[in-house]
Amino acid sequence: MTALTESSTSKFVKINEKGFSDFQIHYNEAGNGETVIMLHGGGPGAGGWSNYYRNIGAFVEAGYRVILKDSPGFNKSDAVVMDEQRGLVNARAVKGLMDALDIDRAHLVGNSMGGATALNFALEYPDRIGKLILMGPGGLGPSMFAPMPMEGIKLLFKLYAEPSYETLKQMLQVFLYDQSLITEELLQGRWEAIQRNPEHLKNFLVSAQKAPLSTWDVSARLGEIKAKTFITWGRDDRFVPLDHGLKLVWGINDARLHVFSKCGHWAQWEHADEFNRLVIDFLRHA
């Protein structure tokens, strides 16, 4: 297979959905087959490609059409200020993307904020989702064991409010378990993405004031989710507590949980090969 690159897979589409009128969404796309839409997290400078470039090739080789979507306000998608909880608004944008691309049904893979988006999508549009894959998703309220917000979330908001290279480095040191993975290339790429889009930083903070994290909690509705669900968590996640994985397994009727040892908040990146094998097997056989 020809090597996939960000530029060779980059596309744009206009969506029209509640809250979005001719709103431009950027995404990366490759492959043919059942559609898998991958949804990134909410850190400064995040985007679909940077979140999932270690995964897209394996899923394409396995026979899937893969879409890495930039959420509204992130990376190359249009700017936005949200006055409702972000997971719900992002879910509407996923539906808008699917409508624009004539995708009737898709499997969703969501990390952190992207996991909150996927949960909301499964609740709001149950007929449009195939299988649901979650990695340390937000949107599950308080923890039984960890003070909230956790250390990583505090650093995330500090980086939004006072962006600096040093704060970015501190956040990534909490983000990943294996510190050797924090290379200058990783830091520089993320820092350039942050600097490229300063409006994104301001809009995220304004949106967080209008709809704070406390409004994201969908725990009481987990029993409504009918999609077969695969949940992964890093044992050493310092952004979203591990006991939220148990909350999902208790709440969703058809769910299973895999915990990665020596893993932080970015399981699909830090343990990419194992993650790819597990999720592809789940998509094929569950």
Swiss-Prot record:
Positions bearing the site annotation: Transition state stabilizer: 112
Catalytic site: 265
Pfam families in the cross-refs:
Abhydrolase_1
Q: Which GO terms describe its cellular component?
A: membrane
What InterPro entries does the database record attribute to this sequence?
AB_hydrolase_1 (IPR000073), AB_hydrolase_fold (IPR029058), AB_hydrolase_sf (IPR050266), Epox_hydrolase-like (IPR000639), HOPD_hydrolase_BphD (IPR017727)
The record's keywords, sorted A to Z, are: Aromatic hydrocarbons catabolism, Hydrolase, Plasmid
Catalytic activity from the UniProt record: 2,6-dioxo-6-phenylhexa-3-enoate + H2O = 2-oxopent-4-enoate + benzoate + H(+)
Instruction: State if Methyltransferase is listed as a keyword.
Output: no
Molecular-function GO terms, alphabetical: 2,6-dioxo-6-phenylhexa-3-enoate hydrolase activity; 2-hydroxy-6-oxonona-2,4-dienedioate hydrolase activity; monoacylglycerol lipase activity
Q: In which pathway does it act?
A: Xenobiotic degradation; biphenyl degradation; 2-hydroxy-2,4-pentadienoate and benzoate from biphenyl: step 4/4
Q: Give the Enzyme Commission number.
A: 3.7.1.8
Which positions form S-S bridges?
none
| Presence of the UniProt keyword Hydrolase in the record | yes
Kindly list the biological process annotations in GO that this record carries: acylglycerol catabolic process; biphenyl catabolic process
Q: Where does substrate bind?
A: 42-43, 51, 111, 180, 190, 266
Family matches, as NCBIfam families:
biphenyl_bphD
This protein's assembly is summarised as: Homodimer.
Q: What does this protein do?
A: Catalyzes an unusual C-C bond hydrolysis of 2-hydroxy-6-oxo-6-phenylhexa-2,4-dienoic acid (HOPDA) to produce benzoic acid and 2-hydroxy-2,4-pentadienoic acid (HPD).
What family, per the record?
Answer: Belongs to the AB hydrolase superfamily. BphD family.
Name of the protein in its database record: 2-hydroxy-6-oxo-6-phenylhexa-2,4-dienoate hydrolase
Gene name linked to the record: bphD
